[in-house]
Amino acid sequence: MASPRFNSIIIILFICTISLSIVSISCKEDLKTNQAALFAFGDSLFEAGNNNYFDSISSFRSNFWPYGKTTFKFPTGRVSDGRIMIDFIAEYAWLPLIPPNLQPGYSNSQLTYGLNFATTAAGVFAGTFPGSVTNLSKDLGTQLNNFKNVEKTLRSNLGDAEARRVISKAVYLFHIGANDYQYPFFANTSTFSNTTKERFIDFVIGNTTTVIEELYKLGARKFGFLSLGPFGCTPSALIINSTKIGSCFEPVTELINLHNQEFPKVLRRLERRLSGFKYALHDFHTSLSQRINNPSRYGFKEGEMACCGSGPLRGINTCGFRNGPSQGYKLCENADDYVFFDPSHLTETAHQQIAELIWSGPPNVTAPYNLKTLFRL
């Protein structure tokens, strides 16, 4: 027969167990209530599958093998072999995977965790890569309008006060503009015959700023931005000039460098002008350039050659028979050895490294806040 002391110990342990369970449940509920959402806007760097729901031409889709082969084991629409930086940032923020906003079937509760509006080939302008989808727009203005619809749904489902809390606490992450600078050369347009490079950059940044201000009017306060990467030095860009294989495409490089000089000035002006406006700006250009130019320092074997593609540096965009079965492609054995998965897009490993810098990078990499700090505000 058990002693009274033993019975007392059992009772105390039982009470402690119940108490810990209650605390655990309370903490989880508190996390759900106070967790900041993540809303993403942009282009193929953040694409999580929206293009699956467009009538897109095949060269702008990634819902076929070998995309997605590393982690998901099937193509999700992400333009990578696996996860992208949005996925990692969501993980660091204790959020579920953030779904593409066009994906059917997500629950209303998912809206309180965020949505991804980014789409391959999207630009600030509606006229950037206009033939990539049929009878639809996916530019930054359209992405803003899609968010406005979500905002209305949040107000309808949660009430005005709770919707305002979700919107003000959320983080809004952007990567946009690179396609606007690449498209004039891709399509051989007369853009720069009619306007100066500086004026064109003003248009790109000005339209981006308008969207930021519209989100601010809706209650958004915390923003994250990536500078534009060295897209004149991707495998696809390195083979544009057949007489200089391996050389960066200078016209795009020049525009991106000018953009990256001007955009931080605009953000500082917004910070001074808009009460409560806080932001993180990650120097994506430097982070990616370092990995292209010195891959072994970051655990890669190849910085300029793509894992999947054809031709010199696998820089021709035929990955997964993208342009039909008549155009074959080569696929590397281990994507983790490569910075680029296809001629223009990063591997999961590269995405993860960049995501870590956006999340918790020091002030010389991500400033004036990093995303970890923004999520805690």
From Swiss-Prot:
Entries under Gene3D superfamilies matching the protein: SGNH hydrolase
UniProt EC number: 3.1.1.-
Compartment(s): Secreted
Primary residence: secreted
Pfam family, one: Lipase_GDSL
Active site, per annotation: 44, 342, 345
Keyword terms, alphabetized: Glycoprotein, Hydrolase, Lipid degradation, Lipid metabolism, Secreted, Signal
Glycosylation sites: 135, 188, 194, 207, 241, 364
This protein's GO CC annotations: extracellular region
DNA repair in keyword set: no
Family: Belongs to the 'GDSL' lipolytic enzyme family.
Name under which the protein is recorded: GDSL esterase/lipase 4
